[in-house]
Curated annotation (Swiss-Prot):
Belongs to the mannitol dehydrogenase family. UxaB subfamily. This is Altronate oxidoreductase. It comes from the Bacteria. GO terms for biological process: D-galacturonate catabolic process; mannitol catabolic process. Transmembrane segments: none annotated. Keywords: NAD, Oxidoreductase. It is an enzyme of class 1 (oxidoreductase).
């Protein structure tokens, strides 16, 4: 069986116009996949050079396959049908290592056609590293490497205004474009680079903040033999992802034309502010996950897919989304409902086995950031507590007992909560404290909740009632009235 390469698998090759920091699965099944579609259907005509930003030889370089690899996109489409689509990606030309090919890295700045910079260097990637110097070959941090590359471009083209770049980071931090820009400016000032360069950075370059959304499941280790047989070739960089994707870019309106989105519509939004889209994702997608996990797991289910195929648990989650989360969010209802519909479809994806216990990690913080704002907004708007979001809090507290049907399971959270719950549930079992007292102690933790939740009218009582129902009847019986 042949391995992918451009000699045996000839086809389109595009001039290099995009630099991408990061060789991982996410960018390959998200950014490069979208660029490939735009190259095929429009005159975008842009090839990608992947820069490996860290010093590692694993996985091997994409250049071993001349940049070629296959994406397998699978899940439920808009009609709820299971689909699987294999695509040979030709948008990546080569990969270089900034550590072993530093001169080649700097030469990327000399190419007049270069226009875009994408990156995913993990959440920790957009950070300051003290001690990074201009003459380091290379500097340690991604922002320092980018500053050096931008200065190379500025110098090579004598500060030409039309040679700036559109920089689109995909790291999962708030306002990633602003954060990256601030660090680039910090290094420029720290390294005492000319004032003209700092002005050029501001005037000729755009740093765009983004929101990225797609579950990328990566290399399908367990299915490789079968998939390669179907494809008819060997591919060491196979990359699998869900059907759904969304790319929200906070940037100039002209970006839509530059990316040719006017000629081939992708699920890419160019917006003035990503904040409402971030809130929508956190509240609906992440919030639904967080409400679902402790309820479904204690009802005897193990994966998100099983939960969504369970009529009662599915009804609980959908009612939480449509009746309690969406009404308090600040975007057009139609847009929110369309997003919610896509979310529940994603949860049902038969190709992804999303373990509830893995999503349960750090559940206390997730509840505070993802559900509490909607719970409190609902109470403020209606004068009553949203029943399902409140029940989810009771289910979460019950989850920290660490026991289901007489069997223990691992609970992962910070040490403070693990110790606290161990102590509280032990006291509860021994009859030292009652359910209402246990709930009040948890809700009074100001350092965690950033407020004293025992002051929210009726919250302690309602959570305690729900928790008693869970303890006495079991999760199935307790949740039924809310389904």
């Amino acid at each position: 069986m042949k391995t992918l390469n451009r000699r045996d698998f000839p086809g389109a090759q595009y001039p290099e116009r995009i630099i991408q920091f990061g060789e991982g699965n996410f960018l390959r099944a998200f950014v490069d996949w979208q660029i490939d579609l735009l190259n095929e259907h429009t005159d975008l005509n842009s090839g990608v050079v992947v820069v490996r930003p860290i010093e590692t030889s694993f996985p091997p370089s994409l250049s071993t396959q001349d940049g070629l690899y296959t994406t397998i996109i699978r899940g439920l489409n808009e009609k709820g049908e299971a689909v699987s689509d294999a695509r040979l990606i030709r948008s990546v030309n080569r990969e270089i290592s900034v550590y072993s090919e530093y001169d080649e890295f700097l030469k990327l700045a000399h190419n007049p056609e270069m226009r875009f910079v994408f990156s995913n260097t993990t959440e920790a990637g957009i950070s300051y590293h003290a001690g990074d110097k201009f003459d380091d070959a290379p500097a340690v941090s991604y922002p320092a490497k980018l500053t050096r590359l931008l200065f190379e471009r500025f110098s090579h083209f004598n500060g030409a205004q039309d040679k700036g770049w559109i920089i689109i980071p995909c790291e999962l931090i708030d306002y990633n474009g602003d954060a990256l820009r601030e660090l680039v400016l910090r290094y420029a000032q720290e390294w005492a680079l000319p004032e003209a360069f700092i002005q050029w950075l501001d005037q000729a370059n755009s740093f765009c903040s983004t929101l990225v959304d797609r579950i990328v499941t990566g290399y399908p280790r367990d299915e490789v033999t079968k998939l390669e047989e179907e494809l008819g070739y060997h591919d060491g960089f196979l990359d699998t992802a869900e059907h759904f994707y969304l790319f929200v870019i906070q940037g100039p309106k002209s970006l839509a034309t530059e990316l040719r989105l006017d000629k081939y519509p992708l699920n890419v939004l160019i917006v003035d502010d990503i904040k409402p889209y971030k809130e929508r994702k956190v509240a609906i997608l992440n919030g639904a996950h967080t409400a679902l996990v402790p309820v479904a797991f204690q009802a005897g289910l193990d994966t998100v897919g099983e939960a969504m195929n369970d009529a009662e648990i599915c009804a609980f989650v959908e009612k939480a989304i449509y009746e309690e989360i969406i009404p308090v969010l600040d975007l057009p209802r139609e847009e929110l409902e369309s997003f919610a519909s896509a979310v529940t479809g994603r949860f049902r994806n038969p190709y992804i086995k999303h373990q509830l216990l893995s999503i349960a990690l750090n559940g206390m913080t997730k509840f505070r950031t993802r559900i509490l704002p909607q719970l409190l907004a609902g109470q403020k708007a209606n004068g009553t507590l949203p029943a399902r979001l409140t029940f989810a809090l009771a289910a979460l507290i019950a989850f920290y007992r660490g026991e289901r049907n007489g069997e223990t399971y691992p609970v992962q959270d910070d040490a403070h909560w693990l110790e606290r719950y161990q102590q509280l549930w032990s006291q509860h079992r021994d009859g030292v404290i009652g359910t209402q007292e246990l709930v009040a102690i948890v809700l009074a933790e100001k350092d965690h909740w950033e407020q004293d939740l025992t002051q929210v009218p009726g919250l302690v009582e309602l959570v305690a009632n729900d928790l008693d129902a869970i303890l006495e009847k079991g999760m199935r019986e307790a949740v039924r009235p809310l389904c």
